[in-house]
Amino acid sequence: KVVIGVSGGLDSTLAFLSLCYMCDKYNIDRSNIIAITLPSGNNSSTTYNNAIDLMKKMNVTYSEINIKEAITRQLQEIGHDCQTKDVTYENVQARYRTFTLMNTANLKGAIVIGTSDMSEVALGWSTFNGDQMAMYGINAGLPKTVIKATTAYFKNIFPEVSDLIDSVIDTPISPELSG
């Protein structure tokens, strides 16, 4: 079993579709993919809807865990005003998502599949103990240009979600941590 956070963005979409492809290729039931979207209130409706629609249409085990209250509580506990959109505000979200994915993996006897790509790691666009941490980083060796091209290629493999793949590719790249 695998656990993956699906945001509706480019990196998580490629990682998610790769897992679906792997299941199909090796005759593994897609219910072994535990896909979770973790909105925080800073997500666009486009990425949120892309995530939900992808998970539904690909027939995986999926859920939504809204982390808005949890991150607000964490920010308050450390004395943050919850209004300043600084690095602390952003990183609490990434860390809480990873915390939730890791705990779900423990509960389900699964591993967490990371979605960070090589460009993000090389440029430092990741959160320590957040999105840079996983049990297997499926995108880790791929620069963003390859991520985009490979995601587009999956339209041929999964025509039932080609419209969603187009929407993901056309959406401006953003971590969506500040609203």
Model regions and ranges:
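A phosphate-binding catalytic loop at a beta-strand-loop-alpha-helix junction
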Residues: 1-26
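General beta-strand structural signal in soluble alpha/beta enzymes
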Residues: 4, 64, 113-115
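Alpha-helix capping and helix-loop boundary segments enriched in small/acidic/polar residues
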Residues: 6-10, 38-46, 62, 88-92, ...
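Amphipathic alpha-helical segments in well-structured domains
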Residues: 16, 48-51, 98, 144
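Short, glycine/charged-enriched secondary-structure capping and boundary segments
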Residues: 18-19, 49-51, 78, 126-130
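Generic long, charged, amphipathic alpha-helical segments
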Residues: 19, 26, 31, 35, ...
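Active-site adenylate/phosphate-handling loop in enzymes that bind or generate adenylated species
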Residues: 22-23, 32, 58, 82-159
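A conserved beta-strand->alpha-helix junction
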Residues: 28, 32-86, 94, 120, ...
